Design a protein with these regions (language model features):
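Multi-pass alpha-helical transmembrane bundles in non-GPCR membrane proteins
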Residues: 1-237
Length: 237
């Protein structure tokens, strides 16, 4: 799809200002979150001894990917909404949608590598559940990014379906996650997923009625990110 054929929403300056601010705040939160997670994993806090073994390495990798996902997704969204209407904004619209998928995959990565990597789900029937979920989610995300990049308008519905399916793949490992995260951690993870889904559904239903629904979507994304960060920080690391 050629760049000049990519349609841009008819947002006014005040709408784009709020869209940019909300995810600009998300980018700042992502930087702080990554810093705090690295501090915790590396054991810089007093009386927190770190064993530099395989578990430590996987958590460092998982945290780095997770933090990267939050920061880049929020930053790209902020920049996209801040740009004037030109071909640059059209390109960033596609990238912005792509990185929503990336955020989902990066969030899964820390849970898969840091919590359930070698655990068995379904009462021990399926070993290495973390790796299986990891591969499935990244495969779905790759498909979603491909479809979205080929034609953002033509495959909009398919992309949304893939986004929701990828986001809820975690239900297949809900039994082991509930055990590993405890009730509080699991509810934070679940709450984040619900926030993402509600935001996407409300935006899909309301976008033709009011452009403010996109800002509402941004707010729900921020809520989802914050809830899942708490799940990671307190119950995975």
């Amino acid at each position: 799809m050629s760049v000049d054929k990519i349609e841009l929403p008819n947002y006014k300056l005040k709408h784009e200002l709020w869209n940019s601010i909300t995810h600009g705040l998300g980018a700042i939160f992502g930087i702080i979150a990554l810093f705090l997670m690295l501090l915790k994993v590396c054991g810089i806090y007093p009386n927190n001894d770190v064993i530099y073994d395989k578990e430590f390495i996987y958590k460092i990798i998982g945290v780095s990917i997770y933090g990267f996902g939050i920061i880049t997704c929020m930053t790209i969204s902020c920049l996209y909404h801040a740009l004037a209407k030109n071909n640059g904004k059209r390109v960033f619209r596609v990238i912005d949608h792509d990185f929503v998928f990336v955020l989902v995959a990066c969030t899964y990565t820390i849970f898969c590598l840091g919590s359930i990597r070698e655990e068995s789900m379904w009462n021990g029937l399926v070993p290495y559940s973390g790796w299986i979920i990891f591969v499935i989610v990244w495969a779905l995300i790759a498909l979603g990014i491909t479809m979205n990049s080929i034609n953002i308008k033509k495959y909009a519905v398919l992309s949304m379906i893939i986004y929701i399916c990828a986001g809820w793949t975690i239900i297949f490992a809900s039994d082991i996650l509930f055990t590993k995260l405890t009730l509080s951690g699991f509810l934070l993870l679940l709450g984040g997923g619900i926030a993402f889904s509600i935001g996407a559904i409300l935006y899909g239903i309301g976008k033709k009625k009011s452009v403010w629904w996109h800002t509402v979507f941004h707010i729900f994304v921020l809520i989802g990110i914050i809830l899942q960060f708490f799940s990671v920080y307190f119950f995975v690391l």
